[in-house]
Regions:
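Loop/turn elements at helix/coil->beta-strand transitions in domains of secreted/extracellular proteins
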Residues: 36, 84-86, 161
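Extracellular glycan-modifying ectodomains
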Residues: 1-39, 46-47, 52-53, 57, ...
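Substrate-recognition element of Asp-dependent hydrolases with the DxDx(T/V) motif
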Residues: 69, 73-104, 118-119
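Well-ordered alpha-helical segments embedded in enzymatic catalytic cores
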Residues: 22, 73-77, 128-131
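C-terminal cap/substrate-recognition subdomain and adjoining C-terminal extension
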Residues: 95, 100-173
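Basic, amphipathic juxtamembrane/active-site segments
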Residues: 51-76, 161-167
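Phosphate/oxyanion-binding active-site loops and adjacent basic polyanion-contact surfaces
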Residues: 12-19, 66, 70, 95, ...
């Protein structure tokens, strides 16, 4: 109410950054500049642990431990992105059977059918991402690649120009 009376602002000053971000996103979407796909690693990205080494029962995901809660929250966030039209895909150095077992973990939020593509193999991740882009007929600039491993992120960023590769600070810890 203070800002209305002083400056005739129709909203709280704290709301302006959120509004500006929303307007910017609308403008970006009108010009086709939003990201369309999120490509995810599995081990230590969608769950804590390495499914091939720890087994499904050894993964940290779900309400039992704080680390597992964090991964479940991240999976919920990814599921919410899917619900608004973001395409989800997997790019993981894993045996496919292990990857699918991890994605079917009883405490997991995401399931194999949430992903349009699951590349769980031992090929370089940049090649898998290029294959996913080709299958979906999307340019690399439509993708975000999320991986806990800084070396994998660096390779993908160098080999797949245009893909967004955010640093997952703290993921290695």
């Amino acid at each position: 109410a203070f800002f209305w009376h002083m400056y005739k602002y129709a909203m709280c000053l704290d709301a302006i950054p959120s509004l500006a971000n929303s307007v910017a996103n609308i403008i970006k979407s009108l010009y086709g500049r939003n990201k369309k796909a999120l490509v995810l690693d599995l081990d230590n990205t969608l769950w804590g642990g390495i499914v091939g080494d720890d087994g499904v029962d050894g993964l940290a995901i779900g309400p039992e431990v704080p680390e597992g809660q964090v991964y479940a929250e991240f999976q919920s966030y990814c599921k919410a992105l899917k619900s608004i039209g973001v395409i989800l895909a997997v790019d993981s150095k894993n045996d496919e059977a292990n990857a699918l077992a991890g994605l079917n973990h009883p405490d997991g939020v995401l399931r194999p059918d949430d992903f349009v593509a699951i590349k769980a193999n031992w090929e370089p991740k940049d090649l898998n991402l290029k294959a996913i882009a080709s299958e979906l007929n999307l340019g690399a600039d439509s993708f975000v690649f999320a991986d806990d491993n800084p070396a994998e992120r660096a390779i993908v960023a160098a080999q797949v120009p245009g893909v967004a590769v955010p640093a997952l600070d703290g993921a290695e810890n």
